[in-house]
From Swiss-Prot:
This is GMP synthase [glutamine-hydrolyzing]. It catalyses: XMP + L-glutamine + ATP + H2O = GMP + L-glutamate + AMP + diphosphate + 2 H(+). Keywords: ATP-binding, Glutamine amidotransferase, GMP biosynthesis, Ligase, Nucleotide-binding, Purine biosynthesis. It comes from the Bacteria. GO terms for molecular function: ATP binding; GMP synthase activity. Residues 199-388 form the GMPS ATP-PPase domain. Pathway: Purine metabolism; GMP biosynthesis; GMP from XMP (L-Gln route): step 1/1. Catalyzes the synthesis of GMP from XMP. The active site is at 85 (nucleophile), 172, 174. The lineage of its organism: Bacteria, Bacillati, Bacillota, Bacilli, Bacillales. Residues 8-198 form the Glutamine amidotransferase type-1 domain. It comes from Bacillus velezensis (strain DSM 23117 / BGSC 10A6 / LMG 26770 / FZB42). NCBIfam families: guaA_Cterm (TIGR00884), guaA_Nterm (TIGR00888), PRK00074.1 (NF000848).
Length: 513
């Protein structure tokens, strides 16, 4: 934490998949927030000087052996504390109340009734719908606490000890299903913690530029530039901070979209006057991927090769100490932490070799995708970069399901170009968060002309989202889908069938691999 942040809400991570949403909601209020491991000591927290502490939810019972705990001394810091779900139970356990397994687990929407006029529920309706997700519950609040809300299955749905600024809720206010959840969090952040709400992307730029300068000093930085939103914003931010100390390397690994390699060089080398070195490594990557079909193995191979390519280039350049990456908050969350399950490894996180020669700089690793776009705009990047489609580091390597071959890459490349062209032609670019084609390792029978065919199927994936943590399938008009399907079947060799993915996230991820 740098001194440029004069107010911050600290969220301690106990393993809930909702944790990042707490941080996100608070930032939406214009207050800076960070998610940190539950293992932080009270002394470390004191040095960070947060305006408030939130104990997140989690999958454990407070009585489980090895369950996640925090330093009890945080309750001696004279800092407001809000416990959410497991966080409320842990607070109760530490402060002398009683937690038990519920006779009936409660998952989903529930109606709560507010009692009195507690601070967290100021100016909110006496009855409201909230999102519950718990197996244990508080059966006896700690001494000096009042019960602020009840529900049919959870008599102690919320509690507080106002003179200490300690609060607990058994439900999840950060989830949209809690209809007044944002208002409750605002009451804690502004009413209890007395935050002002002056944090913005402009502040973030100043904070990160100071961090970069302090970290790098007079040393050199190598940036992994792909031309996507994340790496472009990283390059612009670091270039703004340290200028010519930054060298960008653009690796053409043969897994890019149609026309992408040429576009990247033109935009950054010519348009932004950055030092960009292009490396043609297609054969190197494809040879490594030969015979590999497991998606996790492909991701790690691609991640490793990226680092080794940078190693080779750094040896040529001499004196490179740092590697900059466009790792986002969602990358870290989905790759798992000590308290969260791994969903999939990200090339910016799980694929890094242990013997890499660089120290990492990841200035976006506390931001969500929409915040990165806002940052790009603040940095003066053009709209065609800021609103460019999200594109995974492994590229088309994970949009070809199974083994990657040049023939399959060309199929995905051409079909994806048609999809992007028609989405643009029909003015849908800003309505759809991400859209692309995938090539499952599936062949099916078809008829083209008078001949029987046995060719590949192309899948179209298009989703709406805000930050990529959750998404819904995009309702592209049927007539537009018909145009796209017809063009793909007629213009892309070895395709005789097109399908549309109508699965949300969860249960599916946005990418198929």
């Amino acid at each position: 934490m740098t001194k440029l942040v004069n107010e911050m809400i600290l969220v301690l991570d106990f393993g809930s998949q909702y944790n990042q949403l707490i941080t996100r909601r608070i930032r939406e209020f214009g207050v800076y927030s960070e998610l940190h491991p539950h293992t932080l000591t009270a002394e470390e927290i004191k040095e960070m000087n947060p305006k408030g502490i939130i104990l997140s939810g989690g999958p454990n019972s407070v009585y489980d052996e090895g369950s996640f705990r925090c330093d009890e001394k945080i309750f001696e810091l004279d800092i407001p504390v809000l416990g959410i779900c497991y966080g409320m139970q842990l607070m109760t356990h530490y402060l002398g109340g009683k937690v038990e397994a519920a006779s009936q687990r409660e998952y989903g929407k529930a109606n709560i009734q507010i009692q009195g006029t507690p601070d967290l529920f100021k100016d909110l309706p006496e009855e409201q719908v909230v999102w519950m997700s718990h197996g244990d519950l508080v059966v006896e609040v700690p001494e000096g606490f009042t019960v602020d809300a009840t529900s049919h299955h959870c008599p102690n749905s919320a509690m507080s000890k106002a003179d200490k600024n300690w609060y607990g809720v058994q439900f999840h206010p950060e989830v949209r299903h809690s209809e007044y959840g944002n208002d409750l969090l605002k009451n804690f952040v502004f009413g209890v913690c007395d935050c002002e709400g002056k944090w913005s992307m402009e502040n973030f730029i100043e904070i990160e530029m100071q961090k970069i300068r302090e970290t790098v000093g007079d040393k050199q930085v190598l940036c992994a530039l792909s031309g996507g939103v994340d790496s472009s914003v990283v390059a612009a931010l670091i270039h703004k901070a340290i200028g010519d100390q930054l060298t960008c390397i653009f690796v053409d690994h043969g897994l890019l979209r149609k026309g992408e390699a040429e576009g990247v060089m033109k935009t950054f080398s010519e348009g932004f006057n950055m030092n960009v070195i292009k490396v043609d490594a297609k054969d190197r990557f494809l040879n490594k991927l030969k015979g590999v079909s497991d998606p996790e193995q492909k991701r790690k191979i691609i991640g490793n090769e990226f680092i080794y390519v940078f190693d080779d280039e750094a040896d040529k350049l001499k004196g490179i100490d740092y590697l900059a990456q466009g790792t986002l908050y969602t990358d870290i969350i989905e790759s798992g932490t000590a308290t969260a399950q791994t969903i999939k490894s990200h090339h910016n996180v799980g694929g890094l070799p242990e013997d890499m020669q660089f120290e990492l700089i990841e200035p976006l690793n506390t931001l969500f995708k929409d915040e990165v776009r806002a940052l790009g705009t603040e940095l003066g990047l053009p709209d065609d970069i800021v609103w460019r489609q999200p594109f995974p580091g492994p590229g088309l390597g994970i949009r070809v399901l199974g083994e990657v071959t040049e023939e399959k890459l060309e199929i995905v490349r051409e079909s994806d170009a048609i999809l992007r062209e028609e989405v643009a032609n029909h003015g849908l670019e800003r309505d759809i968060w991400q859209y692309f084609t995938v090539l499952p390792d599936i062949r099916s029978v078809g008829v083209m002309g008078d001949a029987r065919t046995y060719d590949y199927t192309i899948g179209i994936r298009a989703v709406t989202s805000i930050d990529g943590m959750t998404s819904d399938w995009a309702r592209i008009p049927w007539d537009v889908l018909e145009v796209i399907s017809t063009r793909i079947v007629n213009e892309v060799k070895h395709i005789n069938r097109v399908v549309y993915d109508i699965t949300s996230k969860p249960p599916a991820t946005i990418e198929w691999e």
